[in-house]
Amino acid sequence: MGWQNVSFLTDVSHAEPMCDALLEAGALSASIEDADAGTPDEQPQFGEPGSVNTPGWMHSRVVVLLEPDADIEALLAEAGAAIGLSEIPAYSVENVAEQNWVQLTQSQFDPIRVSERLWIVPSWHETPDPAAVNLILDPGMAFGTGSHPTTRLCLEWLERNVSEACTVLDYGCGSGILAIAAARLGAGHVAGVDIDPQAVEAARANAERNGVTALFADSATPVAGEYDVVVANILSNPLRVLAPAICAHVRPGGKLALSGILREQIDEIIAIYAQWIPLQVADVREDWVCLAGIKP
């Protein structure tokens, strides 16, 4: 027997309170979607750090998962009354078949071939090429599973630029994928830093899973020193703000690679970094670019 997936429309002021009330009334899960998604009225909620985002969608859709035998109208009435609604909203119901959700989720993530010798492999998969450099990485809380163009741009750049025993810093490490790749490609000392403590914990766990030694730290315990190679795959606003700090970690003659940059942002980022490191376009994938340069 499956579950009942119930959805209804509401406004931004009632969406979150209704979700809370539904969960309190016994719903298994409750989420909010943009009812205008895929139309010209779609409202983006997440942008660059520092940008002003709206607190919710003006036209919201609440989606609730209920037990198979749940009384939908009674539950909606109870939740609505709890937040002061006098009427039950019009709703639709979709039956959701019972499935092995872990197996279903895992089936959506296949090994990713980055290059001739570099693969990203979820832990539940067999490695397609045991002789390759296989990065064992599961989708999780931290950004960086290898599927995004910027991650692949940085991995390809590292493969071309990491030399035996060089030192590497992954600035904004997320899952730690770039630092782990550098270590597996032959780097000596490898470090990573991220503002998010959860990302640091994920990076440490991923490094252990891959059998590599890397120092990961959050912003409370910043990484010190200069490195032969520094790579930063973060958004363009942090790249602007953190330019002096990032460049300070590159030793004279060392290499820097930046990604998380769109085509239209190339000139601005190059201009900002020019006083420390001359950058040029190293590679492009879709609308994303990787900029790289050598510190004088």
From Swiss-Prot:
Keywords noted in UniProt: Cytoplasm, Methyltransferase, S-adenosyl-L-methionine, Transferase
Q: Where does S-adenosyl-L-methionine bind?
A: T151, G172, D194, N233
The subcellular location is: Cytoplasm
EC number(s) in its UniProt entry?
A: 2.1.1.-
Instruction: Please give one Pfam family short name.
Output: PrmA
Q: What class of enzyme is it?
A: transferase
Species whose genome carries this gene: Dechloromonas aromatica (strain RCB)
Cellular component GO terms, alphabetical: cytosol
Q: Which GO terms describe its molecular function?
A: protein-lysine N-methyltransferase activity
Q: In which domain of life is the source organism classified?
A: Bacteria
Look up keyword Transferase and say if it applies: yes
Q: What's the name of the protein?
A: Ribosomal protein L11 methyltransferase
Q: What does this protein do?
A: Methylates ribosomal protein L11.
Q: What is its main location?
A: cytoplasm
UniProt gene name:
prmA
What chemistry does it catalyse, as a reaction equation? Answer: L-lysyl-[protein] + 3 S-adenosyl-L-methionine = N(6),N(6),N(6)-trimethyl-L-lysyl-[protein] + 3 S-adenosyl-L-homocysteine + 3 H(+)
Keyword Methyltransferase carried by entry: yes
The family annotation for this protein states: Belongs to the methyltransferase superfamily. PrmA family.
Q: Name one GO biological process term.
A: methylation
